Amino acid sequence: MSHEEDLIDYSDEELQTTDAAAAAATAAAAANGAAVKKGDLTVSGARADKKGSYVGVHSTGFRDFLLKPELLRAITDCGFEHPSEVQQVCIPTAILKVDVLCQAKSGLGKTAVFVLTTLNQLEPVPGECSILVMCHTRELAYQIKNEYARFSKYLPDVKTAVFYGGTPMQKDIEVLSSKDTYPNIVVGTPGRLNALVREKKLSLRNIKAFVLDECDKMLDQIDMRRDVQEIFRSTPADKQVMMFSATLSQEIRPICKKFMRNPLEVYVDDDTKLTLHGLQQYYIKLSEAEKNRKLNELLDNLEFNQVIIFVKSTLRANELDKLLRECNFPSIAVHSGVSQEERIKRYKEFKEFNKRICVATDVFGRGIDIERINLAINYDMPADADSYLHRVGRAGRFGTKGLSISFVSSEDDMKTLKDIEKRFEVALPEYPEEGVDASTYMA
């Protein structure tokens, strides 16, 4: 089945957007530092005549965004002083309720764009859901829910709930059965949300904002895309749609825009520049049999706060985790073979710094934001260049320093390495025998 099959189409009447909204989008982007100069940030405003106009970013504070005072207090409590590049460009336009399609590499604060925007717009009504956020993994849903919790700490009337598969649906139904617990903001995975909508437990008739995080992953998989479409059809036509990802191929962009009306398109760094600034990247050529010894050596010799080690299967994750613990390394394993409650428990344990080493499959490869990770090791090479970007993006979040090391043990691994170098126009050096200076990757 092609990407274009079974896609949402609005009627012509629904697709009409006022010139005022289009002008507001372009004006907001312009007011936020628009300049005809080359840079790494490309903005296509609503109905922009020329795609690829460049925007230079001025130093801005969160106060310039005209956010609610309660949000500004929470932002200050979190220790944020200045918005990131993507936040400076997206937030002023998004709070005007214009649709947004945004690609920005890992760690640049995309989540805060939609969390702050939707909280700023929200006027909570008891028993009414106004904001719907969907993502493709349970861990990411849990993390987004926590972001809403910390930014809404001074908005006591705002209720947020997270719903995902792998847990008893009855618990979700109980939350949705009482006006006292019914959420104003729902975060979840498409399968569980679709089930709740079908059972008429979750009403989407009052949705004002519809958000997809890591949207390419969700719209690329046919089953997940169908769930997204079914949920989308249950929401009002007159709503804001925002989609975000670190990778948005030329093929997936038109699919995303099928859900939108005249969106502001923001691409922070073009496709070839998506590798991460501040992240030192190396590879080590070795045999499969040498991997465990080399991993032990790296963990003994490298300085790191926390490390995430990626493997290709749940079986290998369990075996490697067991081996590390036998060698007295403080390790945990997170993968799809672990029960949902246990996965969340282990995720919290790692995030709260109770464990320093996490062995994971690609379930941890996208969107998970743990600020202390500054070392990512590909024990097994990823399947493709996009997966590589999402994996190594766990280290060096929000522009900080980090280190990634990939084990290359076969011809297929070397081919993937060459694909990564070609795709991102980088040359990954071999890891030096003498190691690397900790000051190059430790913040």
From Swiss-Prot:
GO terms for biological process: mRNA processing; mRNA transport; RNA splicing. The keyword RNA-binding applies. This is ATP-dependent RNA helicase SUB2. Belongs to the DEAD box helicase family. DECD subfamily. A motif (Q motif) lies at residues 60-88. It comes from the Eukaryota. It comes from Coccidioides immitis (strain RS) (Valley fever fungus). The Q motif is unique to and characteristic of the DEAD box family of RNA helicases and controls ATP binding and hydrolysis.
